[in-house]
């Protein structure tokens, strides 16, 4: 008789199933001015965006590949198709989405989540959104939740032009420049002054195409006194060639506003995940990051928060699970500019079967940030002797009137704890999985229940076969 797990079991194939590729259009692999110009025409860009793309390409060609983190030698942009258009236009009614794409999102639970607990959903498949919808009562509050292309070409065009890649300019690093040249898809959100969105919005990104890249752009503006919780989910089937994800997230938190940005990333183990996320927080604003990173072959993820206004604050809560063949280099950065600002980073890193997990924290306190407070706590759990976990803190404090602290711990699973749980009827695998889930509860307890269950399921999948 099989033992019942403490969480519902799911099959890894839910994420790894590959749909037949019925693309309406696939750009040739590589990156040239002709390819970027062709993409711009395909997207019907305004002149300023076409020029922005070509300028970003020029910057891309001038910048070097970062060499201070995991090796990116296995990534060759000449073998990556930067744009793949699915065989459908964006729909606002799920019934009109093509059946094969609909089946994929059904397996991933997107429609069920929308019905149960979401104010709006956007679903991107390869390079374009195929579904986007927002509940009428949320739209009635004046909340704007649409795809980036509609915002760029519609009544929010001026707002897009004002904010687009101002927080993350193409000069930031080589993959930011790549994003500026070939971005496609993503979501645009504007929450008006004083509006509190009581249930989350979600965007889900699925990369099905082999040897392709996904470069969605997310732009969120939460106006004065407003609040929002935005959830981002990502997955892809596994191929024997490299795929690339180089999205960009720009978040603007206005005076006394609050934004929580939650991410569950479960990319396939052939993915290079080089996402860039950044937030600008004004006076009295609150920025909360909740991050769970489980997939990809190589991951470089360092959300950055700029605490510009007085009394602004940031919290980052994250968990990373690096298994066999994975090198996940993650962390967070905060820049204190305003007075009496505060930041707190609380992370958990787990590594097994030779996986490498690295946490980088960066705290900058400017001269103007008198009374700033910052605390960083990182705990690492290594499940075997082949795995590796590193913590790399960096602090740049430019005023004496600041309180900054850093704490790091590295450990392994206690044999006594496993024995105790086994004496209560658990298998060794279930006991170890439960301990790891408890270790990562700093993230799961911050998520809506449906997403906490998904995260625990992902941990359980990663733990399978970890005995011995």
Regions found by a protein language model. Give the residues of each.
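Intrinsically disordered, low-complexity terminal tails
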Residues: 2-20, 28-30, 451-467
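N-terminal amphipathic, basic helical "cap/leader" segment at the start of enzyme domains
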Residues: 2-6, 10, 26-172, 176-177, ...
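Low-complexity, polar-biased intrinsically disordered regions enriched in Pro/Ser/Thr/Gly
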Residues: 19-23, 92, 171, 237-240
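Flexible, glycine/charged-enriched surface loops at secondary-structure junctions
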Residues: 68-71, 428, 451
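Conserved beta-strand/loop scaffold segments within soluble protein domains that form the structured core
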Residues: 131-133, 137, 141-426, 440-468
């Amino acid at each position: 008789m099989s033992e019942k797990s403490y969480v519902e079991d799911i099959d890894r194939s839910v994420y790894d199933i590959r749909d037949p590729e019925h693309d309406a259009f696939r750009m040739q692999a590589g990156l040239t001015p002709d390819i970027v110009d062709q993409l711009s025409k395909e997207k019907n860009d305004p002149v300023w965006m076409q020029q922005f793309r070509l300028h970003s390409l020029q910057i891309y060609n001038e910048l070097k590949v970062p060499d201070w983190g995991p090796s990116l030698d296995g990534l060759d942009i000449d073998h990556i198709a930067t744009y793949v258009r699915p065989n459908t236009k964006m729909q606002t009614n799920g019934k009109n989405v093509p059946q094969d794409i609909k089946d994929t999102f059904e397996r991933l639970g997107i429609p069920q989540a929308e019905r149960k607990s979401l104010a709006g959903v956007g679903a991107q498949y390869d390079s374009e959104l195929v579904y986007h919808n927002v509940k009428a009562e949320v739209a009635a509050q004046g909340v704007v939740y649409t795809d980036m292309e509609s915002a760029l070409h519609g009544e929010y065009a001026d707002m897009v032009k004002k904010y687009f890649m101002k927080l993350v300019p193409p000069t930031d690093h080589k993959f930011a420049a790549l994003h500026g040249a070939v971005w496609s898809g993503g979501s645009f959100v504007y929450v008006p002054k004083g509006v509190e969105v009581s249930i989350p919005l979600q965007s889900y990104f699925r990369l099905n195409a082999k040897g392709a890249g996904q470069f969605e752009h997310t732009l969120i503006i939460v106006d004065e006194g407003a609040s929002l919780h935005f959830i981002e989910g990502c997955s892809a089937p596994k191929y024997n060639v490299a795929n690339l994800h180089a999205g960009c997230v720009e978040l603007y938190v206005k005076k006394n506003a609050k934004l929580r940005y939650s991410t569950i990333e479960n990319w396939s183990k052939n993915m290079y995940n080089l996402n860039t996320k950044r937030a600008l927080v004004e006076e009295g604003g609150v920025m909360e990051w909740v991050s769970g990173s489980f997939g990809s072959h190589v991951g470089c993820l360092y959300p950055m928060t700029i605490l510009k206004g007085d009394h602004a604050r940031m919290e980052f809560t994250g968990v990373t699970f690096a298994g066999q063949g994975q090198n996940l280099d993650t962390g967070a950065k905060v820049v204190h500019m305003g007075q009496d600002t505060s930041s707190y980073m609380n992370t958990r890193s787990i590594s097994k079967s030779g996986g490498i997990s690295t946490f980088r924290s960066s705290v900058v306190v400017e001269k103007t940030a008198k009374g700033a407070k910052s605390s960083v706590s990182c705990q690492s759990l290594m499940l075997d002797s082949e795995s590796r976990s590193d913590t790399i803190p960096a602090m740049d404090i430019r005023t004496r009137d600041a309180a900054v602290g850093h704490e790091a711990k590295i450990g392994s699973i206690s044999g006594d704890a496993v024995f105790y749980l086994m004496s209560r009827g658990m298998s060794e695998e279930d006991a170890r999985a439960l301990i790891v889930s408890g270790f990562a509860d700093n993230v799961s307890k911050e998520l809506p229940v449906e997403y906490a269950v998904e995260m625990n399921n992902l941990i359980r999948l990663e733990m399978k076969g970890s005995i011995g």
